[in-house]
Curated annotation (Swiss-Prot):
Glycans are attached at residues 87, 184, 405. It holds the Pfam family Sulfotransfer_1. The modification Phosphoserine is found at residue 460. This is Carbohydrate sulfotransferase 7. GO terms for molecular function: chondroitin 6-sulfotransferase activity; N-acetylglucosamine 6-O-sulfotransferase activity. It catalyses: chondroitin beta-D-glucuronate + n 3'-phosphoadenylyl sulfate = chondroitin 6'-sulfate + n adenosine 3',5'-bisphosphate + n H(+). GO terms for biological process: carbohydrate metabolic process; chondroitin sulfate proteoglycan biosynthetic process; N-acetylglucosamine metabolic process. The keyword Membrane applies.
Length: 484
């Protein structure tokens, strides 16, 4: 009897121990998992923020938080504005007011040479005209999209007055030779150096007939004859003296590529984007088709980089493959094919930029100015003041007069399509109506309709278009706003 009771007690103890052991096995993994999740949270507190740092929604949320901080600072010291030295920058870091950098973001035949010249004429501006031309020429053939990162890195160096990057794309005189050392590079290798006000005036050119502060176009032949080339190091030293550095180019197709530069508080970058009626752009591109053919092919490769597109190029007489046998560039009908197709890619890039800026956070929009060529030539003085105010530059009566006179020339056309001269603004705006066929207009309007709508360019023949023609100088800029 006693033995039976003892066995029963031992059985109960064994059952209890087994139940406790089973419970322990179930609880331990659960406890470990709970601690593991807590550790993950402690180790990566900003995981979601890091993952979303490049989204506009996350940037906008950060902008709202930062705006509250800036407002509290402003309330504590009403004499200081959110952009004054010592306050928070747009990306939340303390910066001082230093050199201003401006990038003029445009495409071919939009009037960007005229816009850039307004900066070139200002005595407080160091201006570079399309320096990325060197990169495109050195890396041809290649599609525009694959070059965007290299263009951005080149811009970063140039804005810091470091021109050694140009050595990578300098063309040696002999194909068998190495590219010249940066110490031996001169201003003569820069694209369109003969019209640069800094290069063609004292102190870099003591014999120049005009001082740097004198407003007026530089005669390229006169500059070439009186201003011997100087080293790029001397140009770098001159660049560092100016409070504003402006670079104009047409080869950057995606505004979003510039976001890392815009977020860099040490760079203090702003962007001026120039648009133009795509029908006028197409008309101007057709007029200068041979000069834009290589560029158009590079843009067109952005859309189609596969074997099918290479076959299209070969069918039209162009060997697109590196190392392939050189072929003649296509004549007028085939050139028109490339120009029209490239314009479709450009309009797609415009639409992408417009949607990007429309949804951008406030800090980015403060660093962005949209300008239309038509508004600039109809109201040159008003738009110039708007441009200078955005760039932090003083107004000048001589520059006002220069802008007005450049838009009141005797004619639109010129024998040299890439030569800057005074133009008739009305001719410049409406020339496409007489020179493009109905089919060409239809093609452009079909390809560019979304961008045209956002920019308030009416389709030909509708009521708004007829009103624009009747009223002539009615400014259109106010109709193109951030809303769709």
């Amino acid at each position: 009897m006693k033995g039976r009771r003892r066995r029963r007690r031992e059985y109960c103890k064994f059952t209890l121990l087994l139940a406790l052991y089973t419970l322990l096995l179930l609880l331990v993994p659960s406890v470990l998992d709970s601690h593991s999740e807590q550790d993950k949270g402690r180790n990566c507190p900003g995981l979601q923020r890091s993952l979303g740092v490049w989204s506009l929604e996350a940037a906008a949320a950060g902008e709202r938080e930062q705006g509250a901080e800036v407002r509290s600072l402003a309330e504590g010291n009403p004499d200081r504005s959110p952009g004054s030295p010592g306050n928070l920058s747009a990306v939340g870091e303390a910066v001082t007011q230093e050199k201003q950098h401006i990038y003029v973001h445009a495409t071919w035949r939009t009037g960007s040479s005229f816009l850039g010249e307004l900066f070139n004429q200002h005595p407080d501006v160091f201006y570079l005209y399309e320096p990325m031309w060197h990169l495109w020429q050195a890396l041809y053939p290649g599609d525009a999209e694959s070059l965007q990162g290299a263009l951005r890195d080149m811009l970063r160096s140039l804005f810091r007055c470091d021109f050694s990057v140009l050595r990578l794309y300098a063309q040696p005189g002999d194909p068998g030779e190495r590219a010249p050392d940066s110490a031996n590079l001169t201003t003569a290798m820069l694209f369109r150096w003969r019209t640069n006000k800094v290069i063609c005036s004292p102190p870099l050119c003591p014999a120049a007939p005009r001082a740097r502060a004198d407003v007026g176009l530089v005669e390229d032949k006169a500059c070439e004859s009186t201003c011997p080339p100087v080293s790029l190091r001397a140009l770098e030293a001159e660049c560092r003296k100016y409070p504003v550095v402006v670079i104009k180019d047409v080869r950057l197709l995606d505004l979003g590529v510039l976001v890392p530069l815009l977020r860099d508080p040490g760079l203090n970058l702003k962007v001026v984007q120039l648009f133009r009626d795509p029908r006028a752009v197409h008309n101007s591109r057709l007029k200068s088709r041979q000069g834009l053919l290589r560029e158009s092919i590079q843009v067109l490769r952005t859309r189609q980089r596969g074997d099918h597109f290479h076959r299209v190029l070969l069918a039209h007489g162009v060997d697109a493959r590196p190392g392939g046998q050189a072929r003649a560039l296509p004549s007028a009908p085939r050139a028109d094919f490339f120009l029209t197709s490239a314009l479709e890619v450009i309009c797609e890039a415009w639409l992408r930029d417009l949607l990007f800026t429309r949804g951008a956070p406030a800090w980015l929009r403060r660093r962005y100015l949209r300008l239309r060529y038509e508004d600039l030539v109809w109201q040159p003085q008003a738009q110039l003041r708007r441009l200078l105010r955005f760039s932090g530059l003083r107004t000048l009566a001589a520059l006002d007069a220069f802008a007005f006179n450049m838009t009141r020339g005797s004619a639109y056309g010129a024998d040299r399509p890439f030569h800057l001269s005074a133009r008739d603004a009305r001719e410049a705006v409406h020339a496409w109506r007489e020179r493009l066929s109905q089919e060409q207009v239809r093609q452009v309007e079909t390809a560019c309709a979304p961008a045209m709508r956002l920019l308030a360019y009416p389709r030909s023949g509708d009521e708004r278009d007829r009103k624009t023609v009747r009223e002539g100088e009615t400014p259109l800029e106010t109709k193109a706003n951030w809303a769709v």
